[in-house]
Each structure stands twice: as C-alpha cells, then as structure tokens.
Design a protein with these regions (language model features):
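A glycine-rich dinucleotide-binding beta-alpha-beta segment and adjacent secondary-structure elements
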Residues: 129-135, 191-251
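Beta-strand segments within the central parallel beta-sheet cores of soluble alpha/beta enzyme folds
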Residues: 9-10, 22-27, 48-51, 196-203
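Short glycine-/acidic-enriched loop or helix-start segments at secondary-structure transitions
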Residues: 62-64, 231, 254-255
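Helical element adjacent to the flavin cofactor pocket in flavoenzyme catalytic cores
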Residues: 1-42
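Generic, well-ordered alpha-helical scaffold segments in large soluble proteins
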Residues: 7, 11, 15, 54, ...
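Hydrophobic, well-ordered secondary-structure elements that form the walls
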Residues: 52, 92, 154, 186, ...
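Mid-domain catalytic core of redox enzymes
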Residues: 26-146
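C-terminal segments that line or cap access tunnels to active or ligand-binding sites in enzymes
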Residues: 95-206
Length: 256
C-alpha cells in the first residue's frame, strides 16, 4: 500500500503538484459557506476554493472547519455515523528468507475458528487474536529487505474501546501479551517464525489512532452498515468546495 501511495504522489509531482511532507493542515477557513483557505500548523494561510480531505469527516468538520462553521444538516448526518474497526498489528523482521519460514504467498489468512460471528465478538475484547492476516512483503518484492532477511506484518482487527479502558500502568504488558498470543496463532501455520524473529514491534488501535489521526484508530472508516456506504454517504460536503475521500466515504478502505 505504501508503494501505491508513493506512485500516486510521484504522478502528482510529475504533473506539477506540490506535496508538503511533515506539514500538517491545521484549519480549513470557511467564509459565506464556501472554502476560503487552509491554515498549516506553522500558521501559513494558503488561499484555495477547493479542499479534498482524506482525514475523515469527523476530524475535518469538527477539528479543522469547526462545528460553528458547519451547516446544521451536516452535523446531524455526522452525528449518525459510527466509528469502525481498527487493528492490532505486529511488525516483524526475520533473519532469513521467506522460503526458510515456509512462506510462499505474500498474504496468508490464519484463523483459529471459521465462525465469523465469534470472530466479530472477539474484536471487541482484549482476548481476540483468533483471526489474523499475515503479509510478507518480500514474497512479491525480493528486494524489499536486505539479502538473507525478510519482513512481515501480522494483523488482527480490533475495536478501540477495550484498549481505551486499559490503565496506562497496564498498557505495556497488555500490548505484549496480546502480541504473544497473535504470534502463537501464526506459529500454527509457520512453526519457525519465533526461531528466526529478530525484531518485533506491536501497534494497538491506540497507536493507529495516534498516527492516523482517525477516531478510534479506524482503518476502514465508518462501521460497515448499509447506511454508511457510498449509496447514502455523499463525498461532497454541504460546504461549497469541500470534498471527502478515502475509506470514510468509500468501501472498506480498498482505495487510495
């Protein structure tokens, strides 16, 4: 997915676009119901008539535009939306090639049960780690890691709520206990994982919330109810010149 993002950015730059990295958009200024400018966190005001935001409608309208500048109908629609799933991710580095681990496919689903209802219930608890997806980047791109090594990520879907209830004093232990359980599940399919594991870094829904800036660390946008699909959710804001893109206004996060 990062390679896809890089390709899109490269094309944007090639056609004359200006991309600013490490430069947060802090505010969207609205005048007379229309987009007027974007203010960066450094205080620079950039005049514009259009903004396409992939930050999600909640941060965009509440944090950047400001509720006081939003039409009442827009806020009413926003209030009806439900924050969707986040994830627990274990990033791993190994001291061998994928073939030595028995990995010959880039993506593998590893599950302890075939019951989707059971799996969904577990996503709302801290004893999940029963359903996972492991992606080894080096299978599709042998040059992704240095020779003789490989990288993989192990992911299971989780809601943020149970993690928000963990006291700070217990967060570290809870996070690594969950990572251990997830790794044990993956070992059922690839028994030599732990033997060749050199580096491992877990990320909880709170980690994703911090770095994505999305409510609940959501990776797929809103909950997948029918009312949250593009059939009912408009990508165009009631504020003239403001548009939404990304998983919050599309399908399942499978789009740039």
């Amino acid at each position: 997915s990062q390679a896809m993002s890089n390709a899109i950015c490269d094309a944007f730059l090639r056609f004359g676009g200006d991309a600013r990295f490490n430069c947060a958009a802090g505010k969207i200024l609205v005048r007379n119901g229309k987009v007027a400018a974007v203010v960066t966190d450094d205080g620079e005001e950039i005049t514009t008539k259009f903004v396409v935001s992939n930050a999600g409608p909640i941060p965009t309208l509440i944090d950047m535009v400001g509720a006081e500048n939003c039409p009442a109908d827009e806020l009413k629609k926003l209030n009806a939306r439900t924050v969707g799933l986040s994830a627990f991710t274990l990033y791993m580095g190994f001291d061998c090639e994928p073939s030595e681990l028995g990995i010959d496919k880039a993506t593998n689903f590893i599950c302890a049960s075939a019951d989707p209802e059971y799996g969904h219930r577990k996503m709302k608890t801290l004893d999940g780690a029963e359903f996972s997806l492991m992606t080894c980047y080096d299978v599709d791109d042998p040059d992704f890691s240095p020779p003789g090594t490989c990288q993989a990520s192990l992911v299971t879907l989780q809601y943020a709520q149970p993690w928000m209830s963990v006291p700070p004093s217990k967060y570290y232990d809870t996070k690594y206990r969950f990572a251990e359980k997830l790794l044990t599940l993956a070992e059922k399919a690839f028994p030599d994982l732990r033997k060749h594991l050199e580096e491992a870094e877990p990320a909880t829904p709170l980690t994703h919330m911090r770095y994505l800036g999305h409510p609940g660390g959501s990776i797929y946008g809103s909950e997948h109810f029918t009312r949250e699909t593009s059939l009912f959710v408009d990508s165009k804001s009631a504020i003239e010149g403001l548009y939404f893109t990304g998983a919050w206004n599309g399908s399942g996060g499978f789009q740039p």
